[in-house]
């Protein structure tokens, strides 16, 4: 995938970039793998706002993705590589020899016509899914399970990857994209390769309207609000926030404040914490 740049014909186009979608082979999704997706606008079942900055945006249909990769021993062939509006990564449609069709996350380098397989006996090649115990040390993987059979939960965004570092008893050491080294049960599955569409992070949205197309509403600074709306609000003119540290709209310390629980059950599985940003 390459980044497409635009001539500065307007203020919105100046600096704007987008994907050239060269890897996409069709714009017609598989209808049997679509599900309705209703917009919530950031509201819960009481109609109360629980997630800010959500609302509007283009209509979408959900693509049912096979994160479990549990179709063992049955080869499948890549039919198409498609755009998915619900995630940063592209997806690939797999036609299995028994007639079933499934979507998977499209790894970097996966081409139409490539044969893939899942299971302990699968080869170590891009797109194949195996238990971590069967993956050699040093292999780059993605779509990693945390519980056997639950489906991949880690390393699913565009361009991300993890690396198998070693094996200790019933656990496998994996270095995640954040730099965190974590112990994961060896029975958990992972897919070989790096997630594709790796230049997604380089895209410059360019204008506010493009964010609105994606369903993202504006973010207002607390310092320009009234004191009853935000701890940073009020004052004459451009006043400082008047606090020892920045606060969230609900009065909690933010911007660097540690929010992870002091006694988290998963601490025993973390060998090295993630790198500081």
UniProtKB/Swiss-Prot annotation:
Protein name: Large ribosomal subunit protein uL2
UniProt entry tagged with the keyword Ribonucleoprotein: yes
Bias (Basic residues) ranges: 258-277
Gene Ontology CC: large ribosomal subunit
Quaternary organization: Part of the 50S ribosomal subunit. Forms a bridge to the 30S subunit in the 70S ribosome.
Species of origin: Bacillus licheniformis (strain ATCC 14580 / DSM 13 / JCM 2505 / CCUG 7422 / NBRC 12200 / NCIMB 9375 / NCTC 10341 / NRRL NRS-1264 / Gibson 46)
Biological process, per Gene Ontology: cytoplasmic translation
Protein family according to the UniProt entry: Belongs to the universal ribosomal protein uL2 family.
Gene: rplB
Domain of life per record: Bacteria
């Amino acid at each position: 995938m390459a980044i497409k740049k635009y001539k500065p014909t307007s203020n919105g186009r100046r600096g704007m970039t987008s994907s050239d979608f060269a890897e996409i082979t069709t714009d017609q999704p598989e209808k049997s793998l679509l599900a309705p997706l209703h917009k919530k606008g950031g509201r819960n079942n009481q109609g109360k706002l629980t997630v800010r900055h959500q609302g509007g945006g283009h209509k979408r249909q959900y693509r049912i993705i096979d994160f479990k990769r549990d179709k063992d021993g049955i080869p499948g062939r890549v039919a198409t590589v498609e755009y998915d509006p619900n995630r940063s990564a592209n997806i690939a449609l797999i036609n299995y020899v028994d007639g079933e069709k499934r979507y998977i996350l499209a790894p970097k380098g996966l081409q139409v016509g490539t044969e893939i397989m899942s299971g302990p006996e699968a080869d170590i090649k891009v797109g194949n899914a195996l238990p971590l115990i069967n993956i050699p040390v040093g292999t780059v993987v993605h779509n990693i399970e945390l519980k056997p059979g639950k489906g991949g939960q880690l390393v699913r965004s565009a361009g991300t990857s993890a690396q198998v570092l070693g094996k200790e008893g019933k656990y496998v050491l994996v270095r995640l994209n954040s730099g965190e080294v974590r112990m994961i049960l060896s029975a958990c599955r992972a897919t070989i390769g790096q997630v594709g569409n790796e230049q997604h992070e380089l895209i410059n949205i360019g204008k506010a309207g493009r964010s609105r197309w994606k369903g993202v509403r504006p973010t207002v600074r607390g310092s320009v609000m009234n004191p009853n709306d935000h701890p940073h609000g009020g004052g004459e003119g451009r006043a400082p926030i008047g606090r020892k540290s920045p606060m969230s709209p609900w009065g909690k310390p933010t911007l660097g404040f540690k929010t992870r629980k002091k006694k988290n059950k998963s601490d025993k599985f973390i060998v090295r914490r993630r790198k500081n940003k």
